[in-house]
Amino acid sequence: MISDMKIIAGRKKFSAIIIVMLISALLLQGCGLFKPTAASLTAKMLKELQKVNSAEVNTKIDSLIGVKVKSIDVGMEMNLGIDNKAEMTKDPERTKENNTLSVSGFGQNVNINYEQYTEKAEDGSKITYVRTEGTPWRKSTEQKQSSEDASGDGSADTGSADTGSGKKPSAFEMIGLLQKAGDTLKDAELKQELVEINGKQAYQINASVGGNLVKELISQSNAGSGKNSIDLESIDWDSISIPTELYIYKESSLPARIKMDCAQLGGEILGNVIADKTENTMLEGVDFEFKTFDVDITIDRYDEIGEIEIPAEALEAEEAGSVEELIPNLSNLF
């Protein structure tokens, strides 16, 4: 009996040793069982992203638009660009942004620089403060949408004019875009080689994002006003595919960068806006085409941002009645 027990104990020890050796061998050899995959990396990224309290978000949008006048068969090109550098905190919910909007083409080059703060008030409303070069601060208040309005009757009275502040996603929405993109990646492929982002090693995942993600983002961005400048239902979102490169920091598992080729999406949206806004105008006979539309978002300095203080003169600013009042020089771009 004792002999049998010794044999069983010996076998258990031997089995345990074999298991340890097997696991060690797998780890040392880099067996696929323990290698990160696109799915495992994005799943962990989404989990870690929920814990973030602050970050620095830099967004660049570069686009090239072809313009053709049908009546005289003349073609031209126009560059549109946005360079946004932002800091964000979750508690309190605030952002500080420096923006440059640029347009070049038709023999001219125009830039508009403006500073912007946003905060979520205690009543749930979103307040945006903006100052362009040489102008005083202006603010826009977007009231929180009531549950009745959220049901979709489109009758929301926001208490302020439609300034269009929701049309450019905030730094928080950029984070949300990363989160949603990571959750809806299609045909994801993890590259074998690590790359360097902001001096840190990162994984690269190539994939595509469906158009319905963008539809949801646009809807959420404009939810407070009860309006959309784009007829979302007239666009075939299912046919839109956005080639995407997602980079995830190796050490922290947090998103480092996302690059999106939005040329197809831009073409659909531009066509929608042009059809709605140019009927019976001088632009009715003009064709527009997005030749390139690249979005590049980089995130760094997670949980390193201190409290964002909104300047006193911004807090005391007058309410803007339109987007032209909020950003006075905007019309100079066109």
Residue positions per predicted region:
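C-terminal motif of bacterial Sec signal peptides marking the signal peptidase cleavage site
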Residues: L28-G30
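Subset-of-secretome marker
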Residues: G32-F334
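Bacterial N-terminal signal peptides that target proteins for export
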Residues: S3-I18
